[in-house]
UniProtKB/Swiss-Prot annotation:
The keyword Manganese applies. GO terms for molecular function: manganese ion binding; metalloaminopeptidase activity. Mn(2+) 1 binds at residues 280, 357, 359. This is Probable cytosol aminopeptidase. Transmembrane segments: none annotated. Its cofactor is Mn(2+). Pfam families: Peptidase_M17, Peptidase_M17_N. The keyword Transmembrane helix does not apply. The active site is at residues 287, 361. The gene is pepA. Mn(2+) 2 binds at residues 275, 280, 298, 359.
Amino acid sequence: MTALTLSTAAASGLRADAIVVGVAKSPKGDKGLVVAPGAEAVDKGYDGKLAAVLETLGASGAEGEVTKLPAPSGFKAPVVVAVGLGAAPEDGQDKGTAFDAEALRRAAGAAARALAGAKKAAFALPVADAADAGTIGEGALLGAYSFDAYKENGRNAKNGKAPLAEVVLLGGKPRDKAFKAAVERAVAVTEELNRARDLINTPPNDLNPESFAAVAQAAAKEHGIKVQVLDEKALTKGGYGGILGVGAGSAAGPRLVKLSYTSSKAKKHLAFVGKGITYDSGGISLKPAGHNETMKCDMSGAAAVFAAVVAAARLGLEVNVTGWLALAENMPSGTATRPGDVLRMYSGKTVEVLNTDAEGRLVLADALWAASEEKPDAIVDVATLTGAMMLALGNRLFGVMANDDAFRTAVVEAAEEVGEDSWPMPLPEHLRKGMDSPTADIANMGERMGGGLVAGLFLREFVGEGITWAHLDIAGPAFNEAAPFGYTPKGGTGTAVRTLVRLAELTAAGDLG
């Protein structure tokens, strides 16, 4: 786990393995480079010619680009790491940093990843205020992440190096309350987000509904969160037909986990619901061969909800947050749900199963109705729900649907504020008819075109009347199969954790409805 601290030490005198500085493209449109604020002392060590040296080495200032060079004479750190911030703002040198927060976050992440194996690195990136310090710290801690639980000696096999051990932020104010709070927030959120990443990356032979529930129970106990776990017996008694139906084919029984964080000062109540399919084979409607090893990530929504609730507790937010983890393994067997079966859901509605690979909406439906019974001020569900959303938005954006346009906008804006890319999506009423069933109240499939929207319409059927609700389909960005970028690693990303935490913060502050 990477440590994060603030320091007022001079860059030249700090004992570290490296000093990280920012470099940007000239705002004038030419090919020149600009050394970003925060690196003045380092630039002085090169007699004011750091930009020229970097240009000679081929640096362009592009976002996330990393260039290493020997530190100036007299510096106690042997290496300078210059990381690209993209285009420099016109007022970047005169009026604060003016650099986009996400550019700072991604730059810090890229630098931290490039420094794997180092024990300590000083980050001299632009810090105009406490928010910048928190942003840079967040990016560095996320970028330093490495999943090495299954590697010999706990080291990443690709480079044989352990993650960067300590990040020291220069340019901040260690005794200032705002700076301290920003760093503490960054640590709490990133540690829980990285825990979500660990869960997503854990092989399905080790992570199943029961073991996931055990992880949630342990974390709840540690952070004073009330937890309730419904096993198969309790789910059967309660009539949770959706969760039971999806888990029917697996030797690992399903679970519904309820995490309740409460604040004595809370005036609002949020409910987060996460899809937790610990492995999705498709069931009887078996998935074709190819990339099935990534289907361990189908519990990313539940991991995000779990992490967000724990982060809210660690931050002591003045809002009640309930997390619902709908956990099941979708496997084919002689006891599995078949296409054509009818399930009676927790809400009392019946669902004709036309495709057992449309299982996420079934477990979510039960959890959404359970969440609705408590009449929260709003419900947000998170799920790797449809390939259709990936076709629509690609691998880096998640779709946002809601039964209230203003709330949908608020969710999209919260995501943008924390650097998560999303896009508002509609719930077209004409697509609802495609889910009509001659046998049951509704079918779990509808028209093929607009499949992500159909799934959202299905979920809406299980939200209590009068309750504000949003659905986040994170199928694209939840698991990165490409090369790492910015602070995003290969594998589980922890998408939506920061959005959920921000929604909780806004609600606590009275700025979200």
